[in-house]
Amino acid sequence: RSYRLPYQEAVLLLLGRKNGKSYEQAKPAKEAPKPFALPEPYGTMRRMYAYLMRQRHIDREVISYFVHEKLLYEDKHHNCVFVGVDGSGEAKHAHIRSTNSEGRVFRMNIESSASEHCFHKNGTDKSLYVFEAPIDLLSHITLNPYGWQEHSYVACCGTSIQPVLERLRQNPKLD
């Protein structure tokens, strides 16, 4: 004990604090959110096609449809990029999935992606099919090809309900 003070007061004295006042905690610096940007595409899509067709057994026509609609491509790191667009067709979300079939699998949503605009396809009928991952969506279409272009699909790219609510908001006639 220092200066015949109780233990707690002695510690406060050694720490340079008076009357038991503590220092205010520093406030964390707020980082400005980064603007959304799609990953840089690679020149060809051979690895993406090979992975989706050979490893995941997705039909070539289904892949080609989403590539043609600019909703699917291969990035410079040879990942599959699943693009989500808003009502005007502008890219607002991107989900990346590695084409690595051995070892660690890499999946992530691009920073600053708008979760309500995940990978989706709008149809003309009242059916909405909901999936956790984009590859699940493509697999379902491959396994159930009859009339698939008439249905609406959404992949939540995780467990958020926001993409489903946005599809229902955009098209109230969906079941």
Question: Regions from the language model: what does each represent?
Answer:
Residues 5, 57-58, 128:
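Helix N-cap/coil-helix junction residues
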Residues 58-75:
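Short, basic/aromatic recognition patches
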Residues 1-53:
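Non-catalytic accessory segments of DNA primases and related replication-initiation nucleases
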Residues 75-170:
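Phosphate-handling DNA/RNA-contact segment within nucleic-acid enzymes
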Residues 1-8, 163-175:
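Modules that initiate DNA replication and primer synthesis
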Residues 47, 56, 97-99:
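Short, cationic motifs built from Arg/Lys/His that form the positively charged side of catalytic pockets
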Residues 54, 58, 80-82:
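Internal active-site segments that recognize and position negatively charged phosphoryl groups
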